[in-house]
């Protein structure tokens, strides 16, 4: 009798896992509670909806996530395929039209002969082979089930989404088109600030009213998606070294570097919507409007979606998962996505790719699949299952620091990254022959 796998959650990780299984002839029940039950952060019933930024970050091989994307591309990732098809201008980054992106994935999976989509809320983990990819907004009932099988308490922090604005309402006389250091095409609209303008903005942020947080939830932020008001609380200069960093963004009108810069990134294929880069926030909507109007060029801006903030949940993976994203105590259960402690869209999808390929091989009797540590995919899997500081385990992005050192030391960082990237792709090429 043919084995059927239950994949719970049709986000980035669940969609990727389901696709990898189905492409290898395995029958999949893809279980997604939306639209029967919505979450505080999702806006549609589409699979792999991007609820934070529309950027999948850097695309170059001198960037950790760029290497990860290229590895996935060579392994026929549905997420990367969709991103390449839905790409919008973003300099050296891979940004997408979020509607085209999730629409392509949804249609591909719904029409796959080996995938059955079930729209219902799951409150108990099914018997048999199961991949849990329920993401940051796992329901309380299912979260308790996960606590029961892992024996670990849940940890919480907040992901935050930036506001999206209409391009037509931007005062184009006050902004300029440029990518940092002129890398790639000029893809960002830049709002330059003088020191006085920045100080007024900064003071307003500190005084702005924050939306209330449930008392039972611990505030624990991951640095990669921190609310800008929390960054501001760390000191007046923090934003200047973060999302408002002016380095490499000289104003072509003056030839000089502004004191601070707010960047706007295209959010849709038509180029009518832009998001405010790095301005993920938990401010009340009225406060967001007042603060944003202090940014030069955005004085009369129309906000089409305010920033929101939502809980995230992840398990203490080094204690409970192996490199195949299997639950050590119950190997028929796998986890994928942010719940495993990988952080980021691409990283989440990569964990689903590993879980899906591994489970397909297990069912087909082909043996286990452990990616080489020299690959970015393998290094992420190794990190979540072997992190040394497992008493304070934190989510991790793809980065070159996760890869083993090169045999020959290279001082120049760019050259070192290029060498590590080439080695990763060489290892993947050889490893792929075993799949």
Swiss-Prot record:
Location(s), subcellular: Cytoplasm
Catalytic activity, as annotated: uridine(54) in tRNA + (6R)-5,10-methylene-5,6,7,8-tetrahydrofolate + NADH + H(+) = 5-methyluridine(54) in tRNA + (6S)-5,6,7,8-tetrahydrofolate + NAD(+); uridine(54) in tRNA + (6R)-5,10-methylene-5,6,7,8-tetrahydrofolate + NADPH + H(+) = 5-methyluridine(54) in tRNA + (6S)-5,6,7,8-tetrahydrofolate + NADP(+)
BP term (GO), one: tRNA methylation
Names of required cofactors: FAD
UniProt-listed HAMAP family: TrmFO
PANTHER family: GLUCOSE INHIBITED DIVISION PROTEIN A, METHYLENETETRAHYDROFOLATE--TRNA-(URACIL-5-)-METHYLTRANSFERASE TRMFO
Protein name: Methylenetetrahydrofolate--tRNA-(uracil-5-)-methyltransferase TrmFO
Species assigned in the record: Staphylococcus aureus (strain JH9)
Lineage: Bacteria, Bacillati, Bacillota, Bacilli, Bacillales
């Amino acid at each position: 009798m043919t084995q059927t796998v239950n994949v719970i959650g049709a986000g980035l990780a669940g969609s990727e896992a389901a696709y990898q299984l189905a492409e290898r002839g395995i029958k999949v029940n893809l279980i997604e509670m939306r639209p029967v039950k919505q979450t505080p952060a999702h806006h549609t019933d589409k699979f792999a909806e991007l609820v934070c930024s529309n950027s999948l970050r850097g695309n170059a091989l001198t960037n950790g996530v760029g290497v990860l994307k290229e590895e996935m591309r060579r392994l026929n990732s549905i997420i990367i395929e969709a991103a390449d098809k839905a790409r919008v201008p973003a300099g050296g980054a891979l940004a997408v039209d979020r509607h085209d992106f999730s629409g392509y994935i949804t249609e591909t999976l719904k029409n796959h002969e080996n995938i059955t989509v079930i729209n219902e809320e799951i409150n108990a983990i099914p018997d048999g082979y199961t991949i849990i990819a329920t993401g940051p907004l796992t329901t309380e009932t299912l979260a308790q089930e996960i606590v029961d099988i892992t024996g670990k308490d849940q940890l919480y922090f907040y992901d935050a989404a930036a506001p999206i604005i209409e391009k037509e309402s931007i005062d184009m006389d006050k902004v300029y088109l440029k990518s940092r250091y002129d890398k790639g095409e000029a893809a960002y609209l830049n709002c330059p600030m003088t020191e006085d303008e920045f100080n007024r903005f900064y003071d307003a942020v500190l005084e702005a009213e924050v939306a209330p947080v449930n008392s039972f939830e611990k505030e624990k932020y991951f640095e990669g998606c921190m609310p800008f008001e929390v960054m501001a609380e760390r000191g007046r200069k923090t934003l200047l070294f973060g999302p408002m960093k002016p380095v490499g963004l000289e104003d072509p009108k003056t030839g000089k570097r502004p004191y601070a810069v707010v960047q706007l990134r295209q959010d849709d294929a038509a180029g009518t919507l832009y998001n405010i880069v790095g301005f993920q926030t938990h401010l009340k909507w009225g406060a967001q409007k007042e603060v944003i109007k202090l940014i030069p060029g955005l004085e009369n801006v129309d906000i089409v979606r305010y920033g929101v903030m939502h809980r995230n949940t992840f398990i203490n993976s080094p204690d409970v998962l192996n490199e195949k994203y299997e639950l050590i105590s119950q190997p028929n259960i796998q986890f994928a996505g942010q719940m495993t402690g990988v952080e980021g869209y691409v990283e989440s999808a990569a964990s689903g790719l590993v879980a899906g390929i591994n489970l397909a091989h297990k069912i087909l009797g082909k043996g286990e699949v452990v990616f080489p540590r020299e690959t970015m995919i393998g290094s992420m899997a190794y990190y979540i299952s072997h992190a040394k500081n497992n008493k304070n385990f934190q989510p991790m992005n793809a980065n070159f620091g996760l890869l083993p050192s090169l045999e020959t030391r290279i001082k120049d960082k760019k050259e070192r990254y290029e060498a590590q990237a080439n080695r990763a792709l060489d290892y993947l090429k050889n490893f792929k022959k075993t799949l």
